[in-house]
Structure formats: C-alpha cells, structure tokens
C-alpha cells in the first residue's frame, strides 16, 4: 500500500482516511522500509496533510499505543459509544517546536487543573527542539519517569494526575524514528503526538506551533470524538495561549468547531514582553514551576492562570474562562496545586 500511497501523494492527490490507516498500519508494524517511510512523510509534508489523513494516522497511533486504563476501562475517544460512566480525562499538551523557549507552561497548568478536581493524563516527551520538554522538567522536579503503566494508572486514579511518557507508551513509533531523524524536517509525526493520548483523554487543550494548524487539528479532534477542547496558537509563535499578543483559538464541542481570536486583556491580564515568559534548562524551569505553584506572582503566573482557565472550561469545571481564572488562582493560593506536585513525586518514587 505504501508504494501506491507515495505515487498518489507525489502527484498531490489526497488520501482518504481509510487509505491513511492502511499506510500507517504498514509503517507502524514494520512493513515499510526506511526509504519508503522517508519518501512518504516528505511527500505528504510537501502536499500538505489533510484533516482526513491526520485523523487516520492518529487512529492507528492510538490503537497501537500501550493503553492507560482509567476508571472502569479504557476510555477510547475514537468510538461513538463513549462510556458516560467514565470520568472526564483532560490533557494539556503542545506540539512543541515553536522556537519561543518559554518555561513549561502546560506542565505547570496540569498541576493547577488537577488540584481543582480534574483527572489529568499529561502526555509528553523530552525536549526535541527546545531546551526543556515536559519530561525533562518533571524529572528535575523529582518525578520518576521510569514507572510502569500500572503506576501511571494508579497516579491518575489516586491523586488525579499522571505523566504519560510518550516513548514508553508508543513502542510502534520505533519504525519511524530513523527516517524522521535523517530527513530532519517537520512531518506529520510532529503533530500526531498530542492527538494520541494513551489514556484516551476526552477533553483537551492543544497548543500548536503554526496558526495554520489551529482549525485543521480542531477538526481532527472533533472527528476523533473529543467532548470539549481548545486548539490554540499564540500569535507570537507560542504553542500556548500567550500574554504577549493575541491568541488564535478553535473551540471543539460535540456540535463542531468555532474559531476566534482572544486577547489577554479580555480576561483581566496585562500583556507582557516575550522575555517575561522565557525559561531555560530543566533545572531552571523546575525552579520556575515550583515558584509559581508556591505563589510567585507576575506574568508567568498569569499565563498559567489563563491557560488553566481554558483547561477547566474544557473539563467542565468552569462555565467560562473568567470563572476558570478565579478557580485556578484559588488552587494555587490555597497550596493545593503545589500539594498535587508533591503527591506525584511521592507516588512515583514509592
């Protein structure tokens, strides 16, 4: 199938979702050669990936991931018949690769939101193009990443947050690692990670590195069965909701997708220079994260509150972002958010 797919894509012919599923199955089962994989993902990038192609690829990655079971079973958001007895699971994640070198905003947000009673399955990896990925900062904070899937499940069930370390749960990705490194360009795999949470997160705040990805990835989430979510891109380049400029945001509901532009001032925050949100290496970012959770004020806290607010709306814990900001601020000021970090450190090191 992959030979036929390459021939179509080089002629700028889009694949159907079913065709993409067949190709990705071949890639992730080891049935395609490195040369075929490299040719295919390069041609796909040059053509431009469609919503159907991304959706098909995401379905295969989800199916082949090691599942993280939450509640009574695996919450699979590819299915139409989602078990309504399952608890809401939220992921706050970005594609990375935005080049802005901010501190780990979504990781900090995850602890704030989890301390508000939302089950959080934080999906992430080590840094690829940035100085510090979510796995790097968590490790520096003292979280043990070398844990079993059962420990991750226990963390989500017991304390309300677990870290899903992508390399440990997406073993079938090994077949694409070599070709991806050797061609050295962004491909479909750069955007698939945030779409393939192994815990089947049914609510999501997804940051993307390019404005043009906002609406397409929102439509992918909708096709995959996302109950409520936001796909965001700061117009300063951030794969987060930013304080420096406007943010382009697509809201995903069961009814469809709507896109708009927001400003920090709408939610009571002053804009700030980009330098106020920058981070550093893992140790430096760990100090920033802990400082925010301990109550440090300023633009870094504000950007966490704003992003957490949309996470709380996605998870149904706030009716709107304004209420979400108030709830998130109280979670930090009460010490609950910091306590959530300490609980995860303790549980993963037992």
Curated annotation (Swiss-Prot):
Its cofactor is Mg(2+). Anthranilate 1 binds at residues 94, 125. GO terms for cellular component: cytosol. Its EC number is 2.4.2.18. Anthranilate 2 binds at residue 180. It is an enzyme of class 2 (transferase). GO terms for molecular function: anthranilate phosphoribosyltransferase activity; magnesium ion binding. 5-phospho-alpha-D-ribose 1-diphosphate binds at residues 94, 97-98, 102, 104-107, 122-130, 134. Catalyzes the transfer of the phosphoribosyl group of 5-phosphorylribose-1-pyrophosphate (PRPP) to anthranilate to yield N-(5'-phosphoribosyl)-anthranilate (PRA). Belongs to the anthranilate phosphoribosyltransferase family. PANTHER family: ANTHRANILATE PHOSPHORIBOSYLTRANSFERASE (PTHR43285:SF2). This is Anthranilate phosphoribosyltransferase. The lineage of its organism: Bacteria, Pseudomonadati, Thermodesulfobacteriota, Desulfuromonadia, Geobacterales. The gene is trpD.
């Amino acid at each position: 199938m992959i030979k036929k797919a390459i021939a179509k894509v080089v002629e700028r012919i889009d694949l159907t979702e079913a065709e993409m599923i067949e190709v990705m199955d071949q890639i992730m089962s080891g049935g395609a050669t490195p040369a075929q994989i490299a040719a295919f993902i390069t041609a796909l990038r040059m053509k431009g990936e469609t919503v159907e192609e991304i959706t098909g690829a995401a379905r295969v990655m989800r199916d082949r991931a090691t599942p993280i079971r939450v509640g009574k079973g695996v919450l699979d958001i590819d299915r139409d018949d989602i078990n309504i007895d399952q608890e809401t699971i939220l992921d706050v994640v970005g594609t990375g690769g935005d080049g802005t070198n901010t501190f780990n905003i979504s990781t900090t947000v995850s602890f704030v939101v989890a301390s508000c009673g939302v089950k959080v399955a934080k999906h992430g990896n080590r840094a690829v193009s940035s100085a510090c990925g979510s796995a790097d900062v968590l490790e520096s904070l003292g979280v043990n990443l070398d844990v079993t899937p059962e420990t991750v499940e226990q963390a989500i069930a017991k304390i309300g947050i677990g870290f899903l370390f992508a390399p440990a749960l997406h073993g079938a990705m090994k077949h694409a690692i070599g070709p991806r490194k050797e061609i050295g360009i962004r491909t479909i795999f750069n955007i698939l990670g945030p779409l393939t949470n192994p815990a089947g997160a049914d609510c999501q705040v997804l940051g993307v590195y390019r404005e043009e990805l906002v609406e397409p990835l929102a439509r992918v989430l909708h096709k995959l069965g996302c109950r409520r979510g936001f796909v965001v891109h700061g117009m300063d380049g951030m794969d987060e909701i930013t304080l420096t400029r406007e943010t382009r945001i697509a809201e995903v509901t069961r009814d469809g997708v709507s896109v708009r532009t927001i400003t920090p001032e709408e939610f009571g925050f002053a804009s700030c220079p980009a330098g106020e949100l920058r981070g550093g290496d893992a140790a430096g970012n760990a100090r920033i994260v802990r400082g925010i959770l301990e109550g440090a004020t300023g633009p870094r806290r504000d950007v966490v509150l704003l992003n957490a607010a949309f996470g709380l709306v996605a998870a149904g814990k706030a009716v709107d972002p304004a209420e979400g900001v108030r709830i998130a601020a109280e979670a930090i000021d009460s010490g609950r958010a910091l306590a959530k970090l300490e609980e995860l450190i303790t549980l993963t090191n037992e």
